[in-house]
C-alpha cells in the first residue's frame, strides 16, 4: 500500500512518467516473487516444536560457572560481552583464549575445574566447548559473540540476556549433536562448494538482501567450482553442493536456514548436482519456481547415520563453517540429546 501511495505521488507531481512507475511496480513485484522462492519467509516462532526443559540448581551470581571467551570473535565482541557479564554474574570465572592457545585444550582444562562450562565466541569456538562439556558431563551455557551465532539462535540464547536468565533460573534442555569422522558439529557440515556458497551469501545479505545474495552466491559457486563424486547408499552422484544438517532444516530446497526440532535424532543430507551448464540452468529455474525437489539434480536423505564415500579422491570437509581436513569417506552420525544446554522456554 505504501509503495502504491508513493507511486501515485510521484506521478501526480510530475516527478516520473506513469510508465516509469508502472515498470517499477512490475520489477519490484518480480523481485519479491523471486525472493520468496529463493528464501521463503521465516515461520512464526509459535510454530516451532516445544522443547522440554529441565531444572538444575539456580546460579543467580554465576556460582560454579567458568566462561571461556574468545576476545577476538566478531571484531572484539567477545571481550566487550565478557565485561558486561562480569556485572550480571559476578561470581563467574572468566578465561580468555589467546591467539597462541589450542582452543580444544583450553576448553578441556576449563571444563575439568567447573560445574558449568560457558562459552562466548563464534560457532567454531562453541563447537569446541560443546565437545568439552559432553566429555565432562557438564551443562553448556552459550553466549553469542560471533558473527552469525547460528547455534545460539537455534537454542534460543540470542541475545546474551537469555543465557544469563537461564543460568540464574537453572533452566536447561537437551539437544542433539552430530559427528563427521568422530569430530563434532552443531549446525552443518559440508564438502565441495557449499561452504563458499554460505560465505558469499552471508557476506552479501546485509547489502543486497537475502534473495539476491542467495542468487549471486549460487551463480558464483556454480560457475567456479568442480563437482565431487559422492557415493551414498550404493549410488554415486556428482555433487557440486553438499549440505549436512544436524537435525532437519527448513525450508526444503537448497537454502536451509533454521530447525524446528533440535532433538529429532536425524541428519539432513542435501545434494545438488550443477556440474554442467545445462544442470545449472535447470537448477536455477527450479529454485526460481519452487520446484527444486522435483528435478533429478537435487536429492534429500534423512537418517540417523550416513556413510558418504568420495570415489574420485579426497575433498576437504567443513564443520560449522570451519574448513578442516581432507577425507575420502565421511562417516556421519547423530548423537541424540547428547548435549545439555542452558536455554529459556522460548526457542527462537
Locate the predicted segments by residue.
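Short hydrophobic-aromatic micro-motifs
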Residues: 183-189, 195-196, 237-245, 250-252, ...
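Membrane-embedded catalytic cores of phosphoryl/pyrophosphoryl-handling enzymes
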Residues: 1-54
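Short, high-confidence coil segments that cap the C-terminus of an alpha-helix
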Residues: 114-115, 172, 303
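Glycine-rich, charged/polar anion/phosphate-binding loops
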Residues: 52-53, 214-218, 225-231, 251-257, ...
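Catalytic core of DAGKc-family lipid kinases
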Residues: 78, 97, 134-240, 246
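ATP/nucleoside-binding phosphotransfer catalytic cores, i.e., glycine-rich phosphate-binding loops
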Residues: 234-236, 271-348
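ATP/NTP phosphate-donor binding region
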Residues: 31, 35-120, 127, 348
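Internal helical hairpin/lid segments
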Residues: 240-292
Amino acid at each position: 500500500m505504501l509503495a502504491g501511495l508513493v507511486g501515485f505521488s510521484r506521478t501526480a507531481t510530475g516527478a516520473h512518467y506513469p510508465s516509469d512507475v508502472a515498470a517499477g511496480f512490475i520489477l519490484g513485484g518480480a523481485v519479491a516473487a523471486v525472493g520468496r522462492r529463493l528464501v521463503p519467509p521465516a515461520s512464526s516462532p509459535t510454530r516451532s516444536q516445544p522443547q522440554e526443559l529441565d531444572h538444575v540448581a539456580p546460579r543467580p551470581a554465576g556460582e560454579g560457572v567458568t566462561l571461556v571467551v574468545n576476545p577476538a570473535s566478531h571484531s572484539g565482541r567477545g571481550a566487550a560481552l565478557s565485561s558486561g557479564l562480569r556485572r550480571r554474574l559476578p561470581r563467574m570465572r572468566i578465561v580468555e583464549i589467546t591467539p597462541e592457545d589450542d582452543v580444544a585444550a583450553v576448553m578441556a582444562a576449563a571444563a575439568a575445574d567447573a560445574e558449568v562450562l560457558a562459552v562466548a565466541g563464534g560457532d567454531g569456538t562453541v563447537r569446541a566447548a560443546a565437545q568439552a562439556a559432553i566429555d565432562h558431563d557438564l551443562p553448556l551455557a552459550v553466549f553469542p559473540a560471533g558473527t552469525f551465532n547460528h547455534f545460539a539462535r537455534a537454542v534460543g540464547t540470542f541475545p546474551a540476556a537469555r543465557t544469563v536468565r537461564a543460568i540464574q533460573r537453572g533452566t536447561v534442555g537437551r539437544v542433539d549433536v552430530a559427528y563427521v569422522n568422530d569430530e563434532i558439529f552443531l549446525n552443518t557440515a559440508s564438502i565441495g562448494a557449499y561452504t563458499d556458497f554460505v560465505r558469499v551469501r552471508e557476506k552479501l545479505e546485509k547489502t543486497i538482501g537475502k534473495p539476491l545474495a542467495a542468487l549471486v552466491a549460487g551463480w558464483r559457486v556454480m560457475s567456479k567450482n568442480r563437482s565431487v563424486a559422492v557415493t551414498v547408499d550404493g549410488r554415486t552422484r556428482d555433487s557440486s553442493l553438499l549440505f549436512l544438517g544436524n537435525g532437519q532444516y527448513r525450508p526444503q530446497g537448497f537454502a536451509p536456514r533454521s530447525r524446528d526440532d533440535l532433538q529429532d535424532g536425524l541428519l539432513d543430507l542435501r545434494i545438488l548436482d550443477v556440474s554442467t551448464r545445462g544442470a545449472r540452468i535447470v537448477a536455477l529455474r527450479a529454485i526460481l519456481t519452487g520446484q527444486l525437489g522435483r528435478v533429478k539434480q537435487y536429492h534429500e536423505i534423512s537418517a540417523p547415520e550416513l556413510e558418504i564415500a568420495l570415489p574420485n579422491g579426497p575433498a576437504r570437509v567443513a564443520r560449522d563453517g570451519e574448513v578442516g581436513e581432507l577425507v575420502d569417506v565421511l562417516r556421519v552420525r547423530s548423537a541424540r540429546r547428547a548435549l545439555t544446554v542452558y536455554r529459556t522456554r522460548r526457542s527462537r
